[in-house]
Amino acid sequence: MLYTFSQSDYPKTELDDYFSYITEKDAVVLWQDGVLLAIKYPDYFAKCKGNCMILKQDILARNLTALLPQSSKIKLISIEELVGITENYLPQLSL
């Protein structure tokens, strides 16, 4: 399953629920304002079982590169890579 997060203001209890369902076979993509989640809640992504990715152009547009946790396992991806990811992971839950 592909989980895409596009907002920065999900309630912590809601994020707890979503991340409890994520398995090794899933992917998580942060884009638009969702890229802020990696900075606000780095512990979620450090413990995430899925393949975590963040859209590079959205990080650059918000000048957040220096704020990303150095130990983060989140991979920066291009828009072209995102297209391939959406083709490979089904179904998709867009949040």
Swiss-Prot record:
The Gene Ontology biological process terms listed for this entry are:
tRNA wobble position uridine thiolation
Position of the signal peptide: none
Pfam families noted in UniProt = DsrH
Q: Please indicate which superkingdom the organism of origin belongs to.
A: Bacteria
Q: Which GO terms describe its cellular component?
A: cytoplasm
InterPro entries xrefs: DsrEFH-like, Sulphur_relay_TusB/DsrH
Name of the protein this chain belongs to:
Uncharacterized protein HI_0577
